[in-house]
């Protein structure tokens, strides 16, 4: 993450880079470490690099070397665990220690699935939500954190077993409760989603986020984008 940010900042500033100075990138992408690279165009406007990691080390590196924070798809759940303020503090402290005087911009990603067909919207998001709950455990969130989401650890154990045994998406999804789904996603019809997004906006605002980013959207992308633009965003 650090090498990517440093290399991109140099390239966008019109400088040439040699990947011997970035050994991790050279090894991972199989770059020739002795070749020099530069962009064949000038960056006409400032390009911000946003940190997409949301664990402590990524937050520290992002605050020091990047220009903003995009807190990913577990934003809703992490906020519910109570861990969000301490993670943001790591990011802000690292930025301040690096000499950045202004608070860096922050975006919160909201997992959304909206449709006139409420059940279709919820089923579309179910497997994704379950996999993200599993991911939170693997990233170090504790049983106590999971319980704060209204989910029991043994429910996550069942997901772990199903995933390990190669369950189909349908089989896996049957193990994902509505509580798990709602811990990660805002999923349902436009009226329901609008009210939940207004609540999420307030949570984001309280923690210093000034912009929401929506992902997934729903089972029918065209319908979901239309509903988002016409029936949800105007309320924001």
What spans do the regions from the language model cover?
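An alpha-helical appendage that flanks or caps ligand/catalytic pockets
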Residues: 1-39, 82-206
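Long, low-complexity C-terminal extensions of enzymes
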Residues: 188-236
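Solvent-exposed polar/charged
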Residues: 10, 63-64, 202, 234
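Short, surface-exposed connector motifs at secondary-structure boundaries
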Residues: 39-42, 67-68, 208-211
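Loop-centered beta-sheet repeat module
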Residues: 43-95
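Hydrophobic faces of well-ordered beta-strands that scaffold small-molecule active sites
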Residues: 49-52, 69-71, 104-110, 210-214
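Acidic-and-aromatic substrate-binding clefts and catalytic sites of carbohydrate-active enzymes
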Residues: 76-82, 113-114, 186, 217-223
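Short, solvent-exposed amphipathic alpha-helical segments in soluble enzyme
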Residues: 66-67, 126-127, 230-231
